């Protein structure tokens, strides 16, 4: 329920001199009110004063039905319509009041206000002039004179706006239209004209705002819905485009342009929806294929190409295809350097490629655009840890595998290197010492990378075998002397080393 105070405020805004309720010089005997109608009028007045607009409206409907020639009933119903923001419904009631009582200056003045807001300037001027000729009160005369001057000024500005539009001076036309629409707020044609100016000036979202207003101000405005749908489509907002073109077809299911556009946007919407569902399911290769279909389905609107590449960039990054991800993410970032999603996805790809400086740069650029994004903050911290780690021991490099290598690849690389660097393969003490160190690193790399939890820690920038990075500072079994490793490997060649070395 609307609060009474709110209603009174609204009434005051729509009726400067007001009507709530003019009763009183016009009531009773002069109107010839019968008992039932008078009851409805009185009850409606009380409900209106209490802010119960819907109930008040019902009473005034009943009064009009009971006495179709009662101008007070129409006038009070117009009051409620205006308080409810229904100016279109109020206007016929005010016109009926004037037909029934030509000297009712309050109704004529109020109708002039509504006509002025609708941009019907000649009709508004006619009402204001008639008020001035009808022996108005001092306040009514002052108000009518003021509004007449305003209507004349709007006529002049309208002519200037049209001249500017015809001369393709859209900036000037917008300036004039801005001023007019502050007064003629319900003029659908002027809003549509300003929307055209905004389109010409490359401001589609402002055009959409005016066209949405025009679609409400003018009945069955299929053209406005069609234009809104086209603008959303060009902006890449396929879902809103589909919604608006459906509104057009609700009004006219045979509208040729709306139907043709509906088929196109529906097809595109389905493709994009399917692609996003595949991404949610982790089916990145299939999602990439879908977005390639999107680009083929709509090659003429650049926004869909950019958005599709942005999502393909994401798919490649998540699917651990860093080379492909970096390439297409970079294409997006050439067009949109501040695209946070592309920056994050390329940064992740750089991490896989062990390009830590580049990853840090991308995360920092993304953070400038969205400093509160936890994913960016965590990614940046990880990249910084990995950079620091890369300057120490890198288990992936030791085994010669990529960061996204599978366990089978890790074991295979480990076996090959363990055989190659087994100390028994070397004769001189210097070579053996070098092999010992290499062999220990290889064993450590295998230990870390074949254990999921240890590998996760290492991938996050923490060396699980480095005592300095462990809480509590415990000893590190892989940072011991070679003597402690004797007995580790099963290779035995009669040399000084005896190992038990198990390939897992």
From Swiss-Prot:
Coiled coil: none
Disulphide linkage map: 248-258, 313-329
Entry protein name: DnaJ homolog subfamily C member 3
UniProt free text on domains: The J domain mediates interaction with HSPA8.
TPR repeats: from-to residues: 37-70, 72-104, 105-138, 154-187, 188-221, 222-255, 268-301, 306-339, 340-373
Gene from which the chain derives: Dnajc3
UniProt subcellular location: Endoplasmic reticulum
Organism placement in taxonomy: Eukaryota, Metazoa, Chordata, Craniata, Vertebrata
Purpose: Involved in the unfolded protein response (UPR) during ER stress. Co-chaperone of HSPA8/HSC70, it stimulates its ATPase activity. May inhibit both the autophosphorylation of EIF2AK2/PKR and the ability of EIF2AK2 to catalyze phosphorylation of the EIF2A. May inhibit EIF2AK3/PERK activity.
UniProt-listed InterPro entries: DnaJ_C3_Co-chaperones (IPR051727), DnaJ_domain (IPR001623), J_dom_sf (IPR036869), TPR-like_helical_dom_sf (IPR011990), TPR_rpt (IPR019734)
Superkingdom in the source lineage: Eukaryota
Quaternary structure annotation from Swiss-Prot or TrEMBL: Interacts with EIF2AK2 and EIF2AK3. Forms a trimeric complex with DNAJB1 and HSPA8. Interacts with THAP12.
Transmembrane segments: none
Stretches the record annotates as Disordered: 451-481
Pfam entry (one): TPR_16
